[in-house]
């Protein structure tokens, strides 16, 4: 299984990166120098590490490129490399920059071609008679796998199918032989037609047939035209193909396993859509939007911490004097309102001053005055309640992470 940068490692790099950039998106040479030199590597090695990690050649390292630089340094220190590698391994190429690496390899002629592996004619259990004919069911399955793994240009890299390789009973040498066979130009990726042919070869090898040594001339020419006659020699081979596919898919035989080619792989994919090669530095890639979400979550956590401190201070103050000024004013107004209502009720019921024989006109005037006072106090109470509610809303907004 290919190496990878684990989530915990990415988190460590993120803490270093965010601290050095103060929340920015890029790390310049001056900011990165203390971190890189702390490794103890020579200056010339660190310069080559920088050039290797700066995939887009903008003179700065974004977070993904910083992860690449740190991982290369750690691999050097741990003895994985004797010296700084001249090119990035495919698994370490940032997913968002894979197209830049592929373009650079194409321009410099550094596209990787696997070592040619000779077929072993004496491989036990393998059969002759590889058939280039693709049944409609097989072709549909190949196209589904292609759709799940193609990049934005409609091409598939060798490493994009790593999970498929692991689900097959096919040696790595045979997989690479098949790749070399349909990729004679040693490109970093192949188009749809070549991908379908590659999957067909793997399917037959999974069934127990030897990898073919050559591609038919007509098929090779159709690769160059980006068109393939998938029914090559179909009239001659159709009857034989039908007899080979006669075994039921659930039979535990080599031909039964053929029908299951890629089924486990596609089930694990769950038709999840485009899946490109490279490392997606989010334990499996974060986009710029996702890293922005990380930054915002960090800021939110800081605001929550500040709010917790403010609330703790409020609670401490409440311990000494429980009532804030708005609450104290509200309580006094409530008490005054209750008193005036009580006076009004006594006057209306003939108690108090009226019972003592007070002047009826005077009582009426007092009653009107009390009513006005009560209305004024109620209006004032409403206004103070609105002010209090506004204060509460502001506190809630601040607490929600404004």
From Swiss-Prot:
Keywords: Actin-binding, Calcium, Cell membrane, Coiled coil, Cytoplasm, Cytoskeleton, Endocytosis, Endosome, Membrane, Metal-binding, Repeat
Topology in membrane: Peripheral membrane protein
UniProt domain EF-hand: residue ranges: 41-76
Subcellular location: Cell membrane; Endosome membrane; Cytoplasm, Cytoskeleton, Actin patch
InterPro entries from the UniProt entry: EF-hand-dom_pair, EF_Hand_1_Ca_BS, EF_hand_dom, EH_dom, End3
CDD domains: EH
Cellular component GO terms held in the UniProt record: actin cortical patch; endosome membrane; plasma membrane
One record GO biological process: endocytosis
Binding site for Ca(2+): 54, 56, 58, 60, 65
Coiled-coil region list: 285-401
Keyword hit for ATP-binding: no
GO molecular function per UniProt: actin binding; calcium ion binding
Intrachain disulfide bonds: none
PROSITE patterns per the UniProt record, alphabetical: EF_HAND_1, EF_HAND_2, EH
Chief place of localization: membrane
Domain EH: 9-99, 138-226
Task of the protein: Component of the PAN1 actin cytoskeleton-regulatory complex required for the internalization of endosomes during actin-coupled endocytosis. The complex links the site of endocytosis to the cell membrane-associated actin cytoskeleton. Mediates uptake of external molecules and vacuolar degradation of plasma membrane proteins. Plays a role in the proper organization of the cell membrane-associated actin cytoskeleton and promotes its destabilization.
Stated name of the protein: Actin cytoskeleton-regulatory complex protein END3
């Amino acid at each position: 299984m290919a190496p990878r940068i684990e989530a915990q490692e990415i988190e460590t790099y993120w803490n270093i990166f965010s601290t050095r950039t103060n929340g920015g998106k890029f790390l310049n040479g001056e900011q990165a120098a203390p971190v890189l030199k702390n490794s103890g590597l020579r200056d010339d090695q660190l310069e080559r590490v920088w050039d290797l990690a700066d995939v887009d050649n903008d003179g700065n390292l974004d977070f993904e490129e910083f992860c690449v630089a740190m991982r290369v340094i750690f691999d050097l220190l741990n003895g994985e490399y004797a010296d700084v590698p001249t090119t990035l391994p495919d698994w370490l190429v940032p997913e968002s920059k894979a197209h830049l690496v592929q373009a650079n390899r194409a321009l410099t002629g550094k596209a990787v071609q696997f070592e040619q592996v000779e077929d072993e004619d004496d491989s036990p259990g393998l059969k002759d008679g590889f058939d280039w004919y693709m049944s409609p069911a097989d072709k549909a399955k190949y196209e589904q796998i292609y759709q799940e793994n193609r990049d934005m240009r409609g091409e598939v890299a060798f490493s994009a199918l790593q999970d498929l390789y692991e689900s097959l009973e096919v040696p790595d040498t045979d997989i690479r032989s098949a790749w070399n066979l349909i990729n004679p130009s040693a490109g970093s990726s192949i188009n749809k037609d070549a991908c379908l042919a590659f999957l067909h070869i793997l399917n037959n090898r999974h069934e127990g047939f030897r990898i073919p040594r050559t591609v038919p001339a007509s098929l090779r020419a159709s690769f160059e035209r980006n068109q393939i006659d998938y029914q090559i020699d179909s009239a001659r081979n159709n009857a034989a193909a039908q007899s080979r596919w006669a075994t039921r898919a659930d039979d535990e035989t080599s031909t039964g396993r053929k029908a299951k080619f890629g089924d486990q792989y596609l089930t694990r994919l769950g038709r999840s859509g485009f899946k490109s090669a490279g490392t997606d530095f989010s334990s499996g890639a974060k986009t710029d939007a996702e890293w922005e979400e990380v930054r915002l979550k960090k800021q939110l956590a800081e605001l929550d911490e500040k709010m917790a401190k403010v609330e703790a201070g409020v609670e401490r103050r409440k311990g000494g004097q429980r009532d804030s000024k708005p609450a104290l004013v509200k309580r006094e107004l409530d008490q005054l309102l209750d008193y005036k209502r009580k006076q009004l009720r006594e006057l209306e019921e003939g108690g108090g001053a009226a019972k003592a024989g007070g002047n009826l006109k005077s009582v009426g005037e007092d009653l009107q005055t009390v009513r006005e006072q009560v209305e004024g106090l109620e209006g004032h109470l409403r206004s103070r309640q609105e002010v209090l509610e506004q204060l509460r809303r502001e506190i809630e907004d601040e607490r929600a992470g404004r």
